[in-house]
């Protein structure tokens, strides 16, 4: 199961920093996707949240309008403005001074967009606020 693998990959870091990851997942939810690509994408999103959170992360996996919705919420400071304002695949204004190159979101959008079903493509978007007040990474797969 995708969530178990991601949680196990981050268990050591989570325990060392005494961070809490809560999982909310709809029961009996099955979806077709490239397992390895989505595990890597989700692992990167969780690792980023662990890097910037204060103490808590919420991993939510639900079905919404015939789509799979995977969200990673954290209680950190949120995403930088340049990342929130970019709808493009490329990150034209990296913040190298703060180690924000935008490559992670670039690859996440490529991976999401490679997942198609009935003429729709997967998407990734970033917001601030969310259930824990910090950044929210949202992956939607058709």
Which stretches of residues belong to each language-model region?
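Glycine-rich ATP-binding loops of the HATPase_c
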Residues: 113-129
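Short conserved segments within the C-terminal catalytic ATPase subdomain
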Residues: 13-22
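Glycine-rich phosphate-binding loop
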Residues: 97-110
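Short beta-strand/loop element within the Bergerat-fold HATPase_c
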Residues: 56-66
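Conserved polar catalytic motif of the HATPase_c/GHKL fold
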Residues: 43-44, 48
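A residue-level detector for a conserved hydrophobic packing site
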Residues: 38-39
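Glycine-rich/acidic phosphate-handling loop/turn and adjacent ATP-lid/helix
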Residues: 73-99
